């Protein structure tokens, strides 16, 4: 009986240790910068099936190519290569590996962000690497401060659960220790981010993980801007 109780206590202790693993957030280093990469809108047309056809001009960036340091950073990677992240009203992005594609849009207003993404889904962060536009009633001021959520997204399995990319896109704003900041809440663990850069999460528990990103001012107050805050749930199996 004592042996059984000891075994149960051992199992409970191990389970408790596994569940209490510390969540950490670290800056991702070493990605190719693609300082001259550029995307611009070539055309947006509405076809007979009520689908919008988007065409983008992309230069100094190869869609479909594998980003050079994919293996080294150990992040979930798309086998189809580099692509465009296409976000509507700060919803989950769709990935596009060519510069021409079609999308169905809501009848209401659609704020659209398209930016260049490395094959492991890290955004290219330069002033020419994104397009921001809107289609519809045009109620949103595109000069507002924006934080768009990008990663993590969806379900992660196996080794991909060990290291998750945290990435977001800032437009018309900057963050710094003295100014605006991004507050990231991962389950119940909070981080204050003062540099716009890619980050990775480690120590996440299996199951559902809730991620909340908030653009806040120097006083830590939520900035009144479209799509702020951003909340997502991802699953680790």
Where are each of the predicted segments found?
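Short, compositionally biased P/S/T/A/G/V-rich stretches that sit at domain boundaries
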Residues: 20-49, 135-158
